[in-house]
Every structure is written in C-alpha cells, then in structure tokens.
C-alpha cells in the first residue's frame, strides 16, 4: 500500500526534474556561452579597427567583460585538440565558436584549470589567448535546483505516507 503512493510521486518527480533541469540548464548555458562568444567576436572586430589603441581595447575588455586577453605572435597554431563530446560545456562552446569562427582557427581547454577556460583564436600573424572564468559559460545553481526539487518531493512523500498509515489505523 505504501508503494502505491510513494512510487508514482517519486517517478513523476524524477521525470519533472530531469526534463526541466536538462532544458533549463542547457538553455541557460547556451545563452551564456553565446554571449561570451559574441563578446570575443566584438573584441576581435574592434581590435581589427586601426582607429583605436590596441592596449586600450584589451584593457577595456579585461576590465568590463572579465576577459584576460593576451596576443601571442606565433604563426604556428596547431594545438592538440582533446574532443570531449560528453561535456555539456565543451559541446556548447564548440557549437557557438563554430557558428562565429572557422573550425581551424580556434582551440579551447576547459580541463586544465578548475575555474577557468583557456580559449585561443587565430588572428593574423598570431593568436589571442583568452582566459575566461568558467562561470561565464555555465550556471552554478545546478545543485540548488536539485535541492529545490528533491526536498519538497521527499516532504510530499512523507506526508502522504503519514496520511496513508493513519487511514489504516
């Protein structure tokens, strides 16, 4: 009799959690990643304009956009690319970068630093190295969302079990 109440509630809660969490998390991360890649594209466009001082542009973007930017003069742009297809952050970043830049002119690493992403984009006779905080690409409220969904589910199950037990006595 207890299973008649508990199992449907737990199953519905699991399905709702997975569907909403997945949809919300992916949409949020996609929007954040798209904004970051657009900022990087804007930086490169402004940097290409000779009307502005290059160091001032880097300083402004570093200060206001939280981007650590360095231009490295090196004609060699052949970084070993570790494809992590099962990482949502990597997949979303790769997709957004492909939409703005050619595949062979960007490279990124999300695993070397715990809280940072190393992103490099080829530019003329070198490349830009962007060090970006990982929280610019992904929402950190996933655990909070999980608790927000799980705790009420357990409370509802416990209350329903109490009512079920009291109805038998």
Where are these regions (language model features)?
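Generic serine detector
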Residues: 23, 38, 48, 62, ...
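Extracytoplasmic
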Residues: 84-152
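Alpha-helical transmembrane segments of membrane proteins, especially the N-terminal anchoring helices
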Residues: 1-26, 32, 129-169
């Amino acid at each position: 009799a207890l299973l008649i109440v508990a199992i449907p509630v737990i199953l519905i809660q699991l399905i709702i959690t997975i569907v909403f969490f997945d949809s919300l998390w992916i949409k949020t991360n996609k929007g954040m990643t798209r904004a970051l890649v657009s900022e990087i594209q804007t930086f490169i466009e402004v940097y290409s304009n000779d009307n502005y001082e290059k160091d001032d542009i880097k300083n402004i973007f570093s200060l206001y956009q939280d981007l650590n930017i360095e231009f490295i003069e090196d004609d060699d742009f052949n970084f070993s690319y570790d494809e992590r297809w099962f990482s949502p952050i990597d997949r979303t970043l790769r997709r957004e970068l492909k939409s703005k830049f050619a595949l062979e002119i960007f490279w990124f690493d999300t695993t070397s630093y715990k809280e940072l992403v190393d992103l490099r984009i080829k530019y003329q006779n070198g490349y830009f190295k962007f060090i970006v905080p990982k929280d610019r690409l992904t929402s950190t409220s996933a655990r909070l969302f999980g608790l927000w969904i799980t705790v009420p589910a357990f409370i509802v199950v416990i209350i329903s079990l109490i009512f079920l037990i009291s109805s038998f006595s």
